[in-house]
């Protein structure tokens, strides 16, 4: 079965020429993907707007109506760092719909896995607040869709954007239906995502922040993946893996100060695909988040698509990061390991009894 992708040119109706997050960003990416023939052999999934009630699963109804009302009134911004246009509600709805369409196609067995190549991004959007170019939280809406419309009990979200997915964390902080793992630079925008923010009430032990030091590179990510993501996934036994796929952790992207490479992105997605293959029938959906340097965005997305389809890693046109990490990631990982017993496992006996094997080496 083939992999799928979602793209719709209507995203360009909502844009701002001076903003890093604009239509030009995604249009430039799609031109690069076509030049590289990266979408050949993939199934293009058509998208139509989902009901507003599905969006309100992640956002309170008052917030959704506020977005629509402010856009109709001609407001230029909904937050200090998130612009509005008259088309913003419809385009943000389409972005959320694309994540749902990709998830639906995977859950219904139409494609093996899928990538939603749409904008605006979503992982900073909280239940009642826009932030960081994000209006609706696409990956959270897709998770609620899987839980409510398909009856899933356990969804795992892995956020690989350079910035902490504070909106996703806030929406699921008290829930044990969704395991949230975020790789991000810390301290950095939006200022949240410390190691010790681990969930509350029923969600205690279901929120993991892999807070990475400046210039953390491929090796740092590999270590964190092995020490945290693998045992968590094995313990949690997800029925679906959703990925907030941000590409601004690349060393060439100045939206952050991290050191991931194109090869590093390939390894991350290949590792997640292997987890999905072993734990949840291959159910894996990537949802585009950040990535503002067109060269590194293109290289990262091509690498991710190759990993999704099971092809070998492409040549990395930009190479590895020239900068060493300023600090090791290990001490924080030790803390996160201590949280794992708080998460209930559907498997008996406990965790670490049958380690998952994935093609992701630490050296």
Residue ranges of each PLM-predicted region?
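N-terminal low-complexity, Ser/Thr- and acidic-residue-enriched intrinsically disordered segments
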Residues: 1-57
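A general "terminal functional-core" signal
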Residues: 1-6, 11-14, 65-363
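Charged, often glycine-rich, active-site loop that binds/positions anionic groups
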Residues: 48-72
């Amino acid at each position: 079965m083939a992999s799928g992708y979602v793209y719709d040119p209507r995203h360009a109706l909502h844009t701002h020429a001076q903003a890093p997050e604009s239509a030009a960003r995604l249009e430039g990416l799609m031109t690069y993907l076509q030049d590289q023939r990266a979408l050949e052999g993939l199934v293009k999934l058509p998208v139509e707007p989902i009901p507003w009630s599905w969006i309100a699963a992640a956002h309170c109804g008052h917030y959704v109506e506020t977005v629509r009302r402010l856009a109709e009134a001609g407001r230029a911004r909904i937050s200090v760092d998130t612009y509005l246009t008259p088309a913003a509600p419809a385009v943000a709805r389409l972005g959320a719909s694309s994540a749902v369409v990709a998830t639906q196609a995977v859950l219904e067995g139409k494609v093996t896995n899928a990538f939603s190549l749409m904008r605006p991004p979503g992982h900073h959007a909280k239940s009642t607040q826009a932030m960081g170019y994000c209006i609706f939280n696409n990956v959270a809406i897709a998770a609620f869709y899987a839980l409510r419309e398909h009856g899933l009990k356990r969804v795992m979200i892995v956020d690989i954007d350079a910035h902490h997915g504070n909106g996703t964390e806030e929406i699921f902080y008290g829930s044990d239906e969704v395991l949230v793992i975020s790789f991000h630079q810390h301290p950095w925008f939006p200022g949240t995502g410390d190691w010790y923010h681990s969930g509350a009430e029923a969600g205690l032990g279901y929120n993991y922040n892999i807070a990475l030091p400046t210039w953390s590179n491929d090796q740092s990510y590999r270590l964190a993946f092995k020490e945290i993501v693998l045992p968590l996934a094995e313990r949690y036994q997800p029925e679906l893996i959703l990925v907030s796929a941000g590409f601004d952790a690349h060393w060439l992207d100045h939206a952050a100060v991290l050191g991931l490479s194109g090869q590093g992105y390939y390894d991350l997605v290949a590792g997640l695909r292997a987890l999905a293959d072993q734990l949840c029938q291959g159910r894996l959906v990537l949802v585009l988040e950040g990535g503002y340097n067109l060269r590194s965005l293109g290289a990262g997305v091509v690498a991710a698509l190759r990993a999704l389809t099971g092809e070998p890693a492409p040549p990395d046109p930009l190479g590895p990061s020239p900068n060493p990490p300023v600090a090791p990631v290990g001490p924080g990982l030790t803390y996160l390991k201590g949280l794992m017993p708080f998460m209930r496992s559907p498997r008996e006996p406990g965790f670490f009894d049958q380690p998952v094997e994935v093609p992701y080496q630490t050296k």
